[in-house]
Amino acid sequence: MSNCFILLAAGKGKRFKSKTLKQFINYKNKPLFMHSIDKALKSNLFNEIVLVTNSKIKLKNKKIKIIKGGKERYQSSLKALNFIKNKKFKNVFIHDAARPNFSINLLKKLSKHLNKNNAVVPFININSSAKYFYKNKIINLNREKIFL
């Protein structure tokens, strides 16, 4: 196992309109970002977890490294990748701290698929109708070819 989990938690959540940053909102008695960290730790898939944030956070787990993020998401991702580039991880998972509703099983499936592929992206099929508005016409889209 040579995996790294990068958790992006430096965002401002401009659309969220709260004094508290979304990733730090308390949910089930802990900050939202901690749900993702806990799942990454419980999965036993990762040698290291990199928390990218612009807030002052201290965590005691030695697997977790905390680094300063950038102004934009891509800058935070790049800072994290530069931070780990000499560590020779086989796989790197990058996730958004404000979206903790993934399962440990999903992490394990992604890891398994990385044994056969260079990159993987999780998705779900849609069940609802999907429409496309183009040149004053509403066009029905084939749900079997649309994923979230």
Where are these regions (language model features)?
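N-terminal glycine-rich phosphate-binding loop and ensuing alpha1 helix
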Residues: 2-53
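Active-site glycine-centered loops adjacent to acidic/histidine catalytic or metal-binding residues
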Residues: 11, 96, 125
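Acidic metal-phosphate-binding loop of nucleotide-sugar-dependent transferases
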Residues: 14, 97-101
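Short aromatic/hydrophobic "clamp" motif used to bind/position activated sugar donors
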Residues: 92
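Conserved core of the sugar-phosphate nucleotidyltransferase
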Residues: 102-148
